[in-house]
Amino acid sequence: MFFFNKNKEKSNNSKLKILSGYNYRYKDIGKESEKTIIKYADYFNFDYEIDKRSSFERHFYWLKIKMFIENLEKGTHEFYLWLDADTFICRYENILNHVDKKKHIFVHNQFFKSKHKTKISNIDYLTWGPNVGVILVRNTKWSLEFFRNVWNKKKYLNHYWPDNAAFMDELGYKA
């Protein structure tokens, strides 16, 4: 059993709070990612919260959904940015200068290998879809309700990609 230090948290800016977390399975990469998150947060004077609990009520991937709900309910910041434990920040640009601040959610999109097969060997179909490893959320009632709905999609608790599948379902995609 691994034991971690208490959650790391900084509080003095109400514009943006960076959220992240990892458990013992992601400890090595999480520690490295944490360094870049703190450096980025300090550079722009953003708040951050890095949760390192050793157990969670669901698969640990769901932690981001729970942290969004808890932080949106508190309402202390205008935006919340989730960064997975394998995220590294290389460019020190203020993310809030690159988004339309009227929108509710910004999510990283990427190509996924489709389950559908082509007739040509070694050629795969690709599907475009969201990846919830990096999400920027504006603090609105709509955002809070959205993440509550994602949390309540219990049919994805045993899915191989549980949090992302529930998120995609809430957007109307097939997971």
Task: Label every model-predicted segment.
Residues 59-62, 66, 137-175:
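Catalytic core and acceptor-binding pocket of nucleotide-sugar-dependent glycosyltransferases
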Residues 84-88:
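The conserved acidic donor/metal-binding loop of glycosyltransferases
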Residues 49-50, 81-82, 106-107, 136:
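A structural signal for short, well-ordered beta-strand segments and their strand-loop junctions
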Residues 122-137, 156-159:
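A recurrent flexible, glycine/aromatic-enriched loop bordering the glycosyltransferase active site
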Residues 2-79, 141:
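N-terminal anchoring/stem segment of glycosyltransferases
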Residues 89-128:
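Conserved donor-nucleotide/metal-binding helix-loop-beta segment in metal-dependent transferases, i.e.
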Residues 31-32, 94-95, 148-149:
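Short coil/turn segments at secondary-structure boundaries
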